[in-house]
């Protein structure tokens, strides 16, 4: 039987960075390649029903091995890695018996406790890091490896009784499209868990309400020598737009349950400037107010510079799954119990982001989120503890056992 970290090291070799510009699903060929690898592996270890959809989703089911009426539990992870940094030619480094000090990644980069204050808690453990040139892909190939390892353990230990266990691997989660083509009905689970969290112990059933905002500003270009009273510099209007948003409600100045507006990208010249934002808030009313503020600013600037100068396009992305999970809190409570059974103190906190589970919960599949063990996702300083990965496998198995014993 393969160890969880061995699987993980194989999966990160496949470049699965998603790309929101391609407008196809999956957005990149590497995700389909990994999906085929995973499907073949699931068949090889003895999983009963395995299929890949035309959109690259991998679905599988380990059939029940007892007559008892047990809930059908799903475990879901995503195959893509974030577009923020390259996932090509990932060259993981294994740090055995970590000494609690700086880790030289290579290529001039150092992972240090001054940057990652949590590092010393992993002293004595085996860590997997990057070489400084790519992200690692623990988000979320660690989750994929943990699920398959748990499933193989069940197959090799038929004395462990369980109901139907549903497995799902999704593409394009990192660009907000992971649930777009998920076949909830065909998946057939009563509820599920995503393995897409970070630090060991994380258990999440609240997430941001999320929207994107595209702001387009049309200016007027006139020769600068005779521009007085005529020119409208769209770049400066864009600056004005940003300055009218709450200046302290940005990612780098917020935490916990605080929301924000995040300017992701700006492209511009005098005649036309485009701004791309994301809007996040845990509170439904606060979320509504943030979106309304974008339209209010556009109206104010259009009064100042002329109708049609500023156009705002808002698009909801996902909503806070809390309202869908709370009526079924046994799902969260079971995960808590499963963690405590293997010596982990659950860390319940809101997700300052989203997971496939957020949208799936509103599609009729309540899906809280469990840790994978990774840290510093989406960049060159990403790393994961092998011990945390092994504990995630234990938690999956404990959840399955608890429901089988009820």
Swiss-Prot record:
Gene: pepT
Lineage: Bacteria, Bacillati, Bacillota, Clostridia, Eubacteriales
Binding annotation for Zn(2+) 2: 139, 174, 378
PROSITE patterns: ARGE_DAPE_CPG2_1, ARGE_DAPE_CPG2_2
Family: Belongs to the peptidase M20B family.
Main localization category: cytoplasm
Pfam families: M20_dimer (PF07687), Peptidase_M20 (PF01546)
Protein name in UniProt: Peptidase T
Keywords (A to Z) from UniProt: Aminopeptidase, Cytoplasm, Hydrolase, Metal-binding, Metalloprotease, Protease, Zinc
The UniProt record lists the keyword Thylakoid: no
UniProt GO BP: peptide catabolic process; proteolysis
Catalytic residue list: 80, 173 (proton acceptor)
Binding sites annotated in the UniProt record for Zn(2+) 1: 78, 139, 196
A cellular component annotation (GO) from this entry: cytosol
Subcellular locations according to the entry: Cytoplasm
Cofactor binding note: Binds 2 Zn(2+) ions per subunit.
Organism: Clostridium perfringens (strain SM101 / Type A)
Gene3D superfamilies (UniProt xref): 3.30.70.360, Zn peptidases
Segment forming the signal sequence: none
Enzyme Commission no: 3.4.11.4
Cofactors required: Zn(2+)
